[in-house]
């Protein structure tokens, strides 16, 4: 009986945690980090503020976890492209275009996760996840060097440039102040332009 109660308690605790993070993500996707206050998150999750603090020391910890979960999803997408049978050039084009288009499909969430002003702890997490994206892009570039599709002396710098292009290029279209609306066709066009640019920058001439 004690084991059963312990198991049920653990399950309930995990569910509470998931509910808190899911609520925080929903709030961020609708209004940004500025709207993701502990009280608001608790109300959205249907729990007390005190319960939120049982799982997280402060708001920044909640935001960092939401950021980590979101970027892990993007990394899985990029890594699946990296491990595919496509050529290095095709992998790079698809990885960049997919990342940009997914950002445009969730504009407020993407803007908040990448650009909205935050405290230093969340900014540090942003830096960490960009390093992970760079690692995947660097692998594609290395494959391209090996196949002769690319000729790059400094893979790390080239990967940084690609990550910079695929992330910062969406600052303007994602900025909530711009209130920009993109239809499906324009998202395809915009993401293709960025992917074309990145491939052209590194491919063998």
Predicted feature residues:
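Hydrophobic/aromatic-rich alpha-helical bundle segments in the mid-to-C-terminal region
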Residues: 111, 115, 145-196, 205
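Hydrophobic alpha-helical connector segments
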Residues: 65, 79-105, 158-162, 188-191
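Generic hydrophobic, amphipathic alpha-helix propensity
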Residues: 13-24, 41, 66-70, 74, ...
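Short helix-capping/turn signature of helix-turn-helix
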Residues: 56, 114-120
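An amphipathic alpha-helix signature
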Residues: 21, 93, 97, 134, ...
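Helix-turn-helix
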Residues: 19, 27-61, 65
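N-terminal intrinsically disordered/low-complexity leader segments
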Residues: 1-15
């Amino acid at each position: 009986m004690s084991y059963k109660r312990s198991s049920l308690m653990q399950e309930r605790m995990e569910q509470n945690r998931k509910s808190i993070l899911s609520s925080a993500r929903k709030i961020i996707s609708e209004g940004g980090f500025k709207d993701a206050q502990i009280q608001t998150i608790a109300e959205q999750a249907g729990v007390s503020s005190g319960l939120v603090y049982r799982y997280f020391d402060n708001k920044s910890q909640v935001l960092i976890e939401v950021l980590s979960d979101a970027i892990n999803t993007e990394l899985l997408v990029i890594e699946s492209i990296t491990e595919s049978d496509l050529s290095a050039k095709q992998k790079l084009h698809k990885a960049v275009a997919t990342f940009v288009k997914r950002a445009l499909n969730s504009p407020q969430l993407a803007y908040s996760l990448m650009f909205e002003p935050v405290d230093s702890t969340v900014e540090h997490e942003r830096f960490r996840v960009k390093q992970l994206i760079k690692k995947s892009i660097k692998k594609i570039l290395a494959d391209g060097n090996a196949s002769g599709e690319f000729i790059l002396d400094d893979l790390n710098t080239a990967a940084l440039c690609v990550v910079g292009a695929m992330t910062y290029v969406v600052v303007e279209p994602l900025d909530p102040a711009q209130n920009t609306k993109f239809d499906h066709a324009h998202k395809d066009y915009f993401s293709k332009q960025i992917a074309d640019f990145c491939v052209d920058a590194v491919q063998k001439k």
